[in-house]
Amino acid sequence: IITVHAEACTHLDRTIEKIKESGVLASVALNPATDLSCLDYILPKLDMVLLMTVNPGYGGQKYIPYLTDKIRDLRQIVEKRNLKTDIEVDGGVTLNNVRGILDAGANIIVAGSAVFHGDVRSNVEEFLKVM
């Protein structure tokens, strides 16, 4: 899968087409303040949407709470349009918020700092219990 940031791509539709023509799964990442409307016409072409729940740049940032609504909104759009698009969330995912993130509609999570700071095995086991 190749993920491109919507904000960094001048010709998003063409980029997605080129990725798909290569036989690769295509995904678009959205920064926290980017509106879901930028996906209106390309969503059916996407295999996944990555919602950044922190501002990109460095690890260990806190999850931005209002983005749970954005996850929920995207899940509703995907279901309303009868699509199979995965929703990935990256940024500030912890044991304290992962259940709410999944309940809102994400089905793929990135939990970097929450897993790799401390005992990795124990952290993974704790995530699996919550999930």
Task: Locate the predicted segments by residue.
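Conserved, mostly hydrophobic/aromatic
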Residues: 49, 74, 90, 101, ...
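Glycine/small-residue-rich loop that forms an oxyanion/phosphate-binding "nest" at active or ligand-binding sites
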Residues: 1-28
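Catalytic cores of alpha/beta
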Residues: 34-46, 91-109
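Active-site beta-loop-alpha junctions enriched in small/polar residues
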Residues: 7-9, 29-33, 54, 90-96, ...
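Glycine-rich phosphate-binding active-site loops on the catalytic face of alpha/beta enzymes
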Residues: 4-10, 50-61, 104-124
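Hydrophobic faces of well-ordered beta-strands that scaffold small-molecule active sites
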Residues: 2-4, 26-30, 49-51, 85-91, ...
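Glycine/Thr-rich beta-alpha phosphate-binding loop at enzyme active sites
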Residues: 32, 42-72, 76, 80-86, ...
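Surface-exposed amphipathic alpha-helices with a cationic face
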Residues: 16-23, 70-81, 125-131
